[in-house]
Amino acid sequence: MKHIISLMLENEPGALSRVVGLFSARGYNIESLTVAPTEDLSLSRMTIQTHGSDDVIEQITKHLNRLIEVVKVVDLTEGAYTERELMLVKVRAVGKEREEMKRMADIFRGRIIDVTEKSYTLELTGDVSKNDAFLEAID
């Protein structure tokens, strides 16, 4: 089962490494990881997406709470949350493909953020199924 775990941890060198090392040492997989400072510049928020049974997630949570840098651990999966995915895709766009890629970006409410002679870089935001549908449509 997919779980999203949110951590508050001290914003200091090596804190990220220790959290990732804990996952690696115990054979847990991190599917997605986001880290950013909070309004309190001494703290960072880390959001981790992982898979595991409730027992495995409980073990992960216990291990994370033992790390000195970790201030708070919350399994967001237990409550209501909104999940969005940001996708950057570089696509070939030559000749007639250029107009087709512009049209596809519009249909999926994406933005062209970079243009070269032979390609576009597109930015799409949405749920996983929307972004997957875009990839299938341009394939």
Language-model regions: role of each:
Residues 1-139:
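A conserved regulatory-domain signal marking ACT and ACT-like small-molecule sensing domains
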